[in-house]
């Protein structure tokens, strides 16, 4: 059951009126610490805040050596870039939106003045289709933050993520979902 793989890595976000998006967000740890990433003003985009990322990476540990990570529905890519900054073995960011994908590439190019310790791939694909093509237990840490307005997307992504997640190395599945839903509703 994927329930065991989520552990305590669950964050809820409030639906409703979207707060003002920051123009820039910063990497908070690792080799890219304090580096700024530009943020698109894109409908449905909700960058994970510094405070939430700090909590997540305190749970995970500051050093992700040996972990293979996926950042699904990557948006700003900040979760994936944080993992890469903290020495993840590999990080794959998946984004379907053409503008968000282009911004991911631009932000990564800026970060490359200090190369990532591991492999970073940014793919312009549908996250669900990508997941379906992956082998069982092929990733250690999976970030899932889908568009909230697309019903059923979260549950489908979780089912596939549970299949490919190998959490034996200390990883797991991190999920962002609307505060209007309970954890039981997505399990």
Region locations from a protein language model:
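Class I S-adenosyl-L-methionine-dependent methyltransferase catalytic core
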Residues: 1-187
